[in-house]
Every structure is written in C-alpha cells, then in structure tokens.
C-alpha cells in the first residue's frame, strides 16, 4: 500500500487527498464507486488540484452517462480537448461500447473495416468471440491517445462499480485477444496471403502483415500498461461513497476486488455529509446526521489505514469551473463545519 500522509498529533491518516498530489510517481488514477455518489465531481476536482502540481493532466470519462461535459459546462468528445480556463488540463469522453470494428477501421487508413470484405468479417467475428472484447476496445482507443500525447497523469472517471471493475480487467482481456489473433496469423498467414494475392493485400489495399504488426505493437503496449496498473507507485484507485448502507457495501466489495487485481487503493472520499448547526430544530437533519454518523464510524473503523476525506452536502449543485475549484479545495484542506 502506498505511503500516505500521517497526522502526527493523533497518529491517524490525514483526511485529505494530499498524499496523491505528493506522490509524484503516480501516472494512473481511477475514481469510482456506486452510481450517484459524486464520482464525476470528485474526479474533476482531483484533476483540478493535480493540474496545479503536474506538467499535464488528462481526465477521461468511461461512464456511458458522460458527465464531464455537464460538470465543466463544456462539450467534450472522444478526442482530448483542453478544459477552458486551464493550460495543462485536458478531458475526453470515450464510448465504453466501442467495438473491434473501430480498431480494424483505425488500423486501415482507407475504407475502414467494411472495406475488408469477407476477410474483415472473419477477423471481426474472431475477435468478438472473446468475452469482454467489445467493451475493451474503448480502452485500446485510450491507450492510443495517451501514448501519442504523453500526459504526466491520467485520471479515469469510471462508470458505476460493476462496470468499473470490468474496465480494470480490459488490459488482460485485450492482451489475450490480440495474442490469439497474432498466433492465428502466424499459423495461417501464408494461407491467407495466398488467398489474398501475391502482395497479401486486403481489399482496401492494406497489407495483412502490416496490420498484424500493428496489432502486435498494441498488444505489447497493453501488456506494459497492465503491469503498470499493478504497481502501487504508478497506479491508485480513489473510492467515492456516501454514508449509507448500500454505498458502504459496494465500497467494501470494490476494495476487496481491487485487492484481488493487485490494484492499490488507500483513499476514500465520503460525500454528502450533513453538518446541522448546533441548536438546529430540523428533526430530519438531526435524524439523518445520526444515521450518517453510524456509517461514517464504520468506515473509519474498517479503513483506519486509509485517507478518509469527509465532504459536506452542499446547497448548490457543483457545476462550472469556479464551483469545482472551490469543491476541490476541500479535497486537500479538511472541511471545518460551521460552529
């Protein structure tokens, strides 16, 4: 587990994400949790703080809802775009339902996958027969952009819990898929080239050997990234939750699965905390605060070796650069409830 900031006064973990900012070696940061707990707000805010201390930061949404555009009040797409008001913060929203057809189209500069004719269909059918490959192709698109643009830190605003954990398996899925395709190409490449003609050209003019070389290069990149995900110096996962039973249950399940994937996690952000003013006569507020405190106590007991960040429930929605910047400050400076 990564070294985190210690509060010398009480020997407790610092209740901020400052340890992530201080860990200069981090390259991949995942932010995830149950739906509706504030993942996007947290990931955007963390990206803003990281942009202050990193050369370049890329924020990627893999959530089908694509809330980055809403959070920053700026339209993002599948290509990285600079976030308005920042010089070194970029964002993109990728389609988690990308397909092998996209990859084949990307390998060919001409007519795309449709131009491969029956051979392209065979390659696509072969690739899609591997479980999880269809979703995993979005990850290949990310790798292609990240490798060419060399960002210092990449933050993933992930989909709700189940999709997040599948996404973290994608490097392994892609690696197996591309390895299988490469093996089949080695075994039957001669036969295919014979069928295609003397120069081994596909119907769109691309050489089969060239395409397989590109696939193999992609496989090598995926293998490298897969190793980086398991290195606590390079990768960490920030869990986001709210102080309720289902969210706490999902967080525990996610932490257990992350451990099984050998992915580091040592930070939990607890959003939507109520802090009723002393003497408040709001019975609902007091009752809800009592319930929240019960689950917050459980979180602090279960994860005493984690940085647990307590974020207040705000009156207004956190949207736009100014509000996100204000929210982001509370990730590195503990929120002090009004007395």
UniProtKB/Swiss-Prot annotation:
CDD domains: ArsA. Disulfide bonds: none annotated. GO terms for biological process: tail-anchored membrane protein insertion into ER membrane. ATP binds at residues 34-41, 244, 271. Keywords: ATP-binding, Cytoplasm, Endoplasmic reticulum, Hydrolase, Metal-binding, Nucleotide-binding, Transport, Zinc. The keyword Transport applies. One of its GO terms (cellular component) is GET complex. It is found in: Cytoplasm; Endoplasmic reticulum. Belongs to the arsA ATPase family. ATPase required for the post-translational delivery of tail-anchored (TA) proteins to the endoplasmic reticulum. Recognizes and selectively binds the transmembrane domain of TA proteins in the cytosol. This complex then targets to the endoplasmic reticulum by membrane-bound receptors, where the tail-anchored protein is released for insertion. This process is regulated by ATP binding and hydrolysis. ATP binding drives the homodimer towards the closed dimer state, facilitating recognition of newly synthesized TA membrane proteins. ATP hydrolysis is required for insertion. This is ATPase GET3. The gene is GET3.
